A protein has these predicted regions:
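Active-site-proximal region of nucleotide-activated glycan assembly enzymes
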Residues: 141-193
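Acidic donor-binding loop of glycosyltransferase active sites
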Residues: 283-293
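N-terminal subdomain of nucleotide-sugar transferases
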Residues: 2-98
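Conserved N-terminal ligand/cofactor-binding loop architecture of enzyme catalytic domains
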Residues: 76-138
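Donor-nucleotide binding loops and adjacent catalytic segments primarily
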Residues: 191-285, 318
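C-terminal amphipathic helix plus adjacent low-complexity
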Residues: 5, 12, 16, 347-402
Length: 402
């Protein structure tokens, strides 16, 4: 069995990728024992010939660590493979730009994090590299990659019907697409969580409704102003008691966490840094305030949390706002005072609206998406066999990125 991978002029780069990933027996160690290949170069092509069919199947996930959502989805797929298939699959998650590209692409993570913290700068960069302004092929290929679908893929997993329709318009066949939802950490999908128990575990007030305020992994957005507005609005001055409690997730923003911890609060407040068990914090709360990151939205929907979107990154996150609002699962406002007013109403005079939005959120939720994806990949692998029938148009395009 052989697979034509790339023209000879690319073979050194491709060898480097496979060697550093450690999957295909180019290096030493246990992976070489599981599966070895002879490398044969002939008439401008490089072929990998498998020796021995019995081996652990390998999955290579290529991603870019520009924003927490990409890595989170990749790691969710990796974890789902482990839960579903154990040692049958070995999964490698690689940042293709950082690990295998040259400058400036290998510096994208640092540049991206700087620009999204300065939203207007990111907005200018995003739209100035749009194909409608730039005709250079290579710039368009990078800048507009988020909106393109490769017609040579075996399968394209779409988070929604709207995305699937766009894929069909861009040349994919219906048989190539599957609408399973966004892959979310298995802990969100299969955990059986009881709100009262979680509040005891997390040392929260068991009687007061709770709002979760998030700023993403980097602690972005108007977190401080919103927190202070909530601290005032969720305190009933007439009765001199709180009507709600506040959980603030500051991510990796240690300065923000330190500032918020130093403030005096009239209501119960917990300030937390980067968290790895968000399913518990979401499960213990009644609504969430966050920017329009797709991963956080998908997680909130699974937990049935009404969502207040208070910001979005121009370009890739803008379309997430109408998805939440138009489906009745939340609202959008950039005003900290308006945000605090909405939460106070949900916790007092508009509890029916809060309940209705929670029900709508659960209707949109797709908790089994990550398991549906890995099961479908497994079925494809079983049908096609290892390294069989992979279209050259796909492999050649991958090689061009290296």
């Amino acid at each position: 069995m052989a697979m034509t991978v790339a023209p000879t002029r690319k073979s050194s780069s491709l060898n480097s990728v496979f060697q550093r990933v450690g999957v295909y027996g180019f290096g030493s160690g246990s992976s070489q024992k599981r599966c070895k290949y002879d490398i044969q170069e002939e008439e401008g092509t490089m072929e990998m010939v498998q020796i021995g069919a019995e081996r652990t199947k390998n999955v290579l996930i290529l991603m870019s660590d520009t924003g927490g959502g990409h890595r989170a989805s990749a790691e969710a797929i990796r974890d789902a493979f482990r839960l579903e298939f154990g040692d049958e699959y070995q999964v490698f998650v690689k940042d293709v730009w950082k690990e295998y590209a040259g400058w400036p692409l290998n510096d994208m993570e640092r540049s991206y994090k700087f620009m999204v913290k300065h939203v207007q700068l990111w907005k200018v960069a995003f739209h100035s590299t749009s194909p409608k302004w730039i005709h250079s092929c290579y710039l368009a290929a990078i800048a507009a990659f988020y909106a393109k679908f490769h017609p040579g893929v075996n399968r394209c997993y779409c988070p929604s019907e709207e995305v699937a329709k766009r894929a069909l318009l861009d040349g994919l066949e219906e048989s190539q697409t599957r609408v399973f939802g966004l892959p979310i950490r298995p802990s969100f999908c299969r955990a059986v969580l009881v709100k009262d128990d979680l509040r005891v575990e997390l040392e929260m007030d068991c009687q007061l409704p709770a709002v979760l305020l998030m700023g993403g992994g980097e602690g972005m957005g108007p977190v401080k102003k919103t927190a202070k507005a909530l601290g005032e609005t969720l305190f009933d001055e007439r009765l001199q008691k709180p009507i709600g409690q506040l959980i603030i997730i500051c991510g990796r923003n240690k300065d923000l966490a330190s500032t918020l911890e130093s403030l005096e609060w009239k209501i119960p407040v917990k300030v937390k840094g980067f968290q790895t068990q968000m399913e518990k914090w979401m499960g213990a709360c009644d609504c969430i305030i966050t920017k329009a990151g797709p991963g956080t939205i998908a997680e909130a929907l699974i937990r049935g949390l009404p969502i207040i979107l208070n910001d979005y990154i121009p370009g890739q996150e803008k379309g997430n706002v109408p998805y939440v609002v138009d489906n009745g699962a939340g609202v959008f406002t950039r005003s900290p005072k308006e945000t605090a007013k909405l939460v106070a109403e949900w916790f007092s005079t508009k509890t029916d609206e809060l309940k209705r939005m929670s029900e709508n959120a659960l209707k949109l939720a797709q908790p089994n998406a990550v398991f549906d994806i890995v099961k479908d990949i497994h079925e494809l692998a079983c049908q096609r066999g290892p390294l069989a029938n992979i279209p050259y148009v796909f492999t050649s395009s991958f090689s061009s990125l290296i």
